[in-house]
Design a protein with these regions (language model features):
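Single-pass membrane-anchoring alpha-helices
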Residues: 2-20
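Histidine-centered metal-chelating micro-motifs
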Residues: 45-49, 84-99
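Short acidic-glycine-tyrosine-enriched beta hairpin
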Residues: 30-34, 74-93
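Ligand-binding loop in jelly-roll beta-barrel domains
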Residues: 92-115
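A short glycine-rich, His/Asp/Glu-containing loop-to-beta-strand
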Residues: 24-49, 53-59, 112
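Glycine- and acidic-residue-biased ligand/ion/polar-headgroup-sensing regions
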Residues: 54-73
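Short histidine-centered beta-strand/loop micro-motifs
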Residues: 40, 48-53, 70-71, 79-80, ...
Length: 115
């Protein structure tokens, strides 16, 4: 019985380690020469790394969410909240700051990149 419990605990711990190391999940829903549509899922507490936007893009929030934005210029952290159905625009070449999901469940977005 002890061996079974220890095996279950070790398996659970390994699962948590694997899940913790996974970056935001991306699933390309549609792509052609003009556009790419991707569903992105952000796990609680997981940062999305900073980057430069390669294309103009529209982001549609599929879930209510709360996230921390780390300003790349000043290092200032701000909390932002979005509602399901909110839509935002970003220009090509913009600095995409580090974002961290502050909620207790994953949230999803649809990113429409114009090529």
């Amino acid at each position: 019985m002890k061996k079974l419990i220890l095996t279950a605990l070790a398996s659970s711990a390994l699962t948590l380690l694997v899940v913790k190391a996974v970056p935001p999940a991306n699933a390309v829903k549609f792509e052609n020469a003009k556009v790419q549509v991707t569903e992105v899922t952000y796990a609680p507490g997981e940062p999305r790394p900073r980057g430069i936007r390669q294309h103009d893009q529209v982001i549609v929030f599929l879930d209510d969410c709360r996230y921390e934005r780390l300003d790349p210029q000043t290092g200032q952290k701000t909390i932002r909240e979005r509602k399901s159905g909110d839509v935002i625009w970003h220009d090509k070449g913009e600095d995409a700051p580090q974002l961290t999901n502050q909620g207790n469940k994953p949230y999803r977005t649809i990113v429409v990149e114009l090529k």
